[in-house]
Amino acid sequence: MRHFYSILTLLLVGLLSAQNNEPEIDFDSPDSLYREDQFYIGLSYSNMQNAPSGFDQLKISPNVFFGFLRDMPINKSRTWAIGAGLGYRISVMNHNLGIPENGNSDSYTILQSAFDKNRLTVHYAELPIEIRWRASTPESHRFWRIYTGLKLSYLVYNHYSFDGSGLTIKQKGNPDLDKLQYGAYLSAGWNTWNAYIYYGLNPIFKSATIEGKEIKMNTFNIGLMFYIL
C-alpha cells in the first residue's frame, strides 16, 4: 500500500508540474487562420435589358437577396480566397407587360390602357461561386474588397398580379418563365459599403412571345451588398 501511495504522489506531482509548464492561451490574440465575409445580404434595383418595343418599367423593381458563402483562402496571407455557398433572392418587377391568364405563350401584350398594378414576383434559390481579393489582416475587419463570380439561380416560386380597368388577375406558376437562370456579378467596396452589379446571361422567359417575336429580356441589377462575419 505504501508503494501505491508513493506512485500516486509521483503521478500527482508530475501532472501538476506539466500543467504549470503548459503555455498560456491568449484568447484575445488575432487568429491567423481567420475567414471573412461568410454571410451576406443585399438590395438592388432591376433594369431589364433586351426588352420588347414599348416595354416600360414602372415604379421601382427591387431585389432582396441573402445567403451564406464558405470562405476558402488559397494563399498564406489569406488575401485571396474562393467563396461558394447557398442563397435566396426575391425580385419584384413592376412593368407594363401583360401576362396572359391561361399561360398561353403567344398572348403577351404591351398594356396600353391605364392600370393600378401589373407586377411579377419571383423567388430564386441561388448557388454563387466567386473569386475573392481583399486587403484584410487578422487584426482588422475594415478593408477593401473585390469579389467576382457566377451565380446559378433556380426558380422556386412566381406570382403575377394585375389590377385595373375593373379586372383583377392573380396567377402562380407561370410555365413560360425559365426555371434556370445564370449570370455574372461583381461586388466591390470598403468595410460595410459595397457596390454590387449582376448581369443575367439568359432570358427570364423561355417561351413567351409578342406578335410572334420571342421575349428575350434579361436582368441587369445594380445595388449594395453587405457582409457579416
Predicted regions and their residues:
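Bacterial Sec-dependent N-terminal signal peptides
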Residues: M1-E24, L224-L229
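Short loop/turn motifs that connect adjacent beta-strands in outer-membrane beta-barrel proteins
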Residues: I25-D37, P73-W80, S136-W144
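Predominantly the C-terminal beta-signal and adjacent terminal strand-loop region
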Residues: S29, Y34, G173-L229
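Transmembrane beta-strands of outer-membrane beta-barrel pores
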Residues: L43-Q49, L86-N94, W133-A135, L150-N158, ...
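Surface-exposed strand-loop-strand hairpins of Gram-negative outer-membrane beta-barrel proteins
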Residues: S46-G67, G173-D176, F205-S207
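Outer-membrane beta-barrel transmembrane strands
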Residues: A51, K117-T137, W144
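Extracellular/periplasm-exposed beta-strand and loop segments of Gram-negative cell-envelope proteins
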Residues: P52-K59, M93-G103, Y108-V122, L155-G183
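Residues on the lipid-exposed face of transmembrane beta-strands in outer-membrane beta-barrel proteins
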Residues: F66-M72, L86-Y88, L127-W133, T148-L152, ...
